[in-house]
């Protein structure tokens, strides 16, 4: 499943809305049927106008004359503008990590032992558009794994090489679990499979280490910080599955498998990062 960012799409499937769609919204169907109101940019309301120069828009951000929604659309506009640069940087960093990163090389070797192969052909960098819903949620991701296609890295969401290393490690744990246990990755039959691989991926990838939580997400908690991070990110990822009803359902499923999956560090002897 996708490496979640702070806001991930919910997996509920409410009844179809019957009201007329407003001009600044478009309905998007995701996760097996959920209907979300995705906001398009309205320069008169947001202050962001793609027809003006980058520096004019940047000045609006500095002076507070661009709304939070406008800043979201401005950022997405820059991602589109800089797509070629971001893809080139992502591919260079990916290749470097496959040559020199201990965790990436180790996971690649373990996947090979199970008959799989990960390389530039099935670990691909792409621009992944985020979307802003009418209720203010940002739907985005840093990467994703598909048993049929391999690993997707969202080049525009990757901050630096260390972030890419964590993202690759997360998705490679999913690939390992798929090859070793043939897990029900998307949770079509059993959400507990999805919950277990998400717990393991967040635990083993390094994305929940204290320094990233503190300096990256502003969470300075010391007691139980690691466990809380792994649990919350697993819940977010399970929540995004189509068969998950709501956050309460996701929490229940994660709790059901927590003890066995949180203690399972395979293929590592212990938590590496």
From Swiss-Prot:
Record EC number: 3.4.24.-
One GO BP: mitochondrial protein processing
Biased composition regions of type Polar residues, renumbered to the chain: 1-11
Bias type Basic and acidic residues, positions: 17-27
Role summary: Has a dual role in the assembly of mitochondrial ATPase. Acts as a protease that removes N-terminal residues of mitochondrial ATPase CF(0) subunit 6 at the intermembrane space side. Also involved in the correct assembly of the membrane-embedded ATPase CF(0) particle, probably mediating association of subunit 6 with the subunit 9 ring.
Protein name: Mitochondrial inner membrane protease ATP23
Gene Ontology molecular functions: metal ion binding; metalloendopeptidase activity
Organism: Pyricularia oryzae (strain 70-15 / ATCC MYA-4617 / FGSC 8958) (Rice blast fungus)
Annotated Pfam families: Peptidase_M76
Membrane disposition: Peripheral membrane protein
Signal peptide range: none
């Amino acid at each position: 499943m996708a490496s979640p960012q702070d806001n991930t799409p919910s997996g509920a499937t409410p009844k179809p809305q019957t009201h007329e769609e407003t001009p600044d919204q478009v309905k998007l169907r995701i996760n097996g049927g959920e209907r979300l109101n995705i906001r398009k940019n309205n320069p008169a309301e947001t202050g962001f106008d793609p027809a003006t120069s980058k520096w004019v828009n940047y000045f609006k951000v500095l002076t507070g004359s661009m709304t939070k929604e406008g800043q979201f659309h401005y950022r997405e506009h820059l991602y589109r503008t800089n797509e070629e640069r971001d893809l080139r940087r992502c591919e260079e960093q990916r290749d470097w990590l496959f040559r020199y990163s201990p965790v990436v090389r180790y996971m690649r070797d373990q996947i090979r032992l199970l008959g799989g192969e990960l390389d530039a052909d099935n670990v691909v960098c792409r621009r992944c558009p985020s979307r802003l819903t009418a209720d203010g949620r940002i739907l985005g991701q840093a990467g994703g794994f598909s048993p049929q296609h391999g690993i997707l890295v969202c080049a525009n969401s990757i901050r630096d090489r260390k972030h890419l290393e964590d993202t690759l490690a997360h998705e490679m744990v999913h690939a390992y679990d798929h090859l070793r246990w043939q897990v029900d990755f998307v949770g079509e039959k059993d959400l507990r499979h999805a919950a277990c691989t998400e717990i393991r991926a967040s635990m083993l990838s390094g994305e929940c280490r204290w320094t990233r939580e503190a300096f990256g997400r502003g969470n300075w908690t010391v007691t139980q910080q690691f466990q809380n991070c792994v649990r919350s990110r697993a819940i977010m990822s399970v929540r995004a599955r189509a068969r998950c009803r709501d956050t309460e359902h996701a929490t229940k499923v994660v709790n059901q498998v927590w003890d066995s999956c949180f203690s399972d560090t395979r293929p590592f002897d212990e938590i590496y990062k």
